[in-house]
């Protein structure tokens, strides 16, 4: 069965909440031409209801506003209206304090919510999902009551996402300690965000809540028992979060081992409902039972994720982590590089000092680290539960 072609025959109606903010704008940009999803409703603050999107929004992305979005009306959020339009999937770019109330209500009304908000990330039955890192966590939606009920799936904090993508292939080496300093762009603070007087020609050495998020989320996503030490700084850059990372491992490791792990890992989703036979794994990873048990990774060396029509989900690159072999790279101005744009994590300056491995990484905080991550999560859901989504019957 050709999943991609079947889904494309009839696009799936979706809605975006918080559509006027920076992350909301990225959602609209990604969904306007998406091969699987039809943008059917957008919502902003109450004061903007029934107003035309193009007239109301200060567009801040480095790409033009999609014409299909420009003339859409911002609408109030009503459950009956969503149901009447056949909308089941909702992308949430709501502030955490609003999402804490709205998203559980949508779940109770049988909607499938893919959220960028942090409000529900730490609930035990709500996954923090990164398809190429922990796809097996999608099954948490069944703990929330799916298919009888709706669910909420979250993506990680933007800085966490980039680091988790880089560390995912390295779990087999048994990470003992993680030291990370982040240099985060102003777009991560939203719009209008920080005052120019605060940030221009300056750096702010503390971002409230950010360091705790990285610690908690990395441990949940990667199932790490490692000690994590994070320091987060805001810098006067528009897009892209740069991170410097030092790792200490349980066993001796060389930089060539790190490179091989990054280069050999591709995301190849399994067929519908067989996803949980394995996590995303490297094709050169053949662990012994002891190593697999210790790292929390699959012990069956043949349980590799198979190809879907020669490529991955529409929003995911075949190679999620790309190493740049030049001492001056990566840089934040490259955050929209790659294909799909903004969805690759770039690493560089890989080196060994004593018993520690160091490297630099760059993640696009708005695409990979926010809206693009949520869209990829929805794609993984559609692919995994395709039979149910088309027939309403569990396979």
Where are these regions (language model features)?
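Charged docking surfaces used in two-component/phosphorelay signaling
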Residues: 187-395
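N-terminal Rossmann-like NAD(P) cofactor-binding subdomain of oxidoreductases
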Residues: 2-200, 227, 273, 284-298, ...
């Amino acid at each position: 069965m050709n999943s991609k072609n079947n889904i494309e025959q009839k696009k799936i109606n979706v809605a975006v909440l918080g559509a006027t903010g920076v992350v909301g704008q990225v959602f609209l940009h990604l969904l306007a031409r998406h091969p699987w999803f039809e943008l059917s409703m957008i919502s902003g603050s109450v004061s903007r209801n029934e107003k035309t999107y193009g007239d109301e929004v200060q567009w801040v992305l480095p790409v033009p506003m999609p014409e299909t979005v420009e003339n859409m009306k911002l609408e109030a959020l009503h459950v009956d209206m969503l149901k009447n339009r056949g909308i089941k999937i909702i992308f949430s770019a709501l502030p955490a304090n609003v999402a804490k109330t709205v998203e559980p209500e949508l779940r109770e009304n049988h909607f499938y919510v893919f959220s960028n908000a942090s409000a529900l990330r730490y609930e035990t039955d709500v996954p923090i999902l990164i398809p190429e890192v922990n796809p097996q966590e999608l099954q948490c939606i069944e703990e929330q009551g799916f298919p009888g009920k709706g669910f909420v799936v979250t993506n990680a904090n933007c800085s966490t996402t980039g680091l988790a993508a880089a560390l995912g292939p390295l779990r087999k080496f048994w990470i003992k300690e993680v030291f990370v300093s982040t240099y985060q762009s102003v777009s991560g603070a939203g719009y209008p965000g920080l005052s120019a007087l605060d940030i221009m020609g300056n750096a702010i050495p503390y971002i409230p809540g950010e360091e705790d998020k990285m610690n908690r989320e990395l441990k949940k996503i990667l199932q790490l028992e490692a000690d994590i030490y994070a320091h987060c700084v805001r810098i006067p850059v528009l897009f892209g979060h740069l991170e410097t990372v030092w790792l200490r491992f349980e066993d001796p490791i060389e930089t060539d081992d790190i490179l091989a792990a990054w280069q050999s890992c591709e995301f190849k989703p399994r067929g519908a409902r067989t996803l949980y036979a394995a996590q995303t794994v490297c094709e050169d990873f053949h662990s012994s039972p002891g190593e697999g048990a210790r790292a929390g990774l699959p012990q069956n060396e043949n349980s590799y994720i198979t190809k879907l029509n020669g490529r991955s989900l529409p929003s995911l690159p075949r190679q999620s982590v790309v190493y740049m072999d030049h001492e001056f790279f990566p840089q934040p101005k490259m955050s929209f590089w790659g294909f799909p744009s903004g969805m690759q994590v770039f690493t560089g300056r890989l080196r060994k000092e004593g018993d520690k491995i160091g490297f630099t990484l760059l993640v696009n905080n708005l695409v990979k680290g926010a809206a693009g991550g949520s869209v990829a999560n929805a794609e993984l859901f559609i692919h995994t539960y395709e039979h149910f989504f088309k027939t309403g019957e569990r396979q």
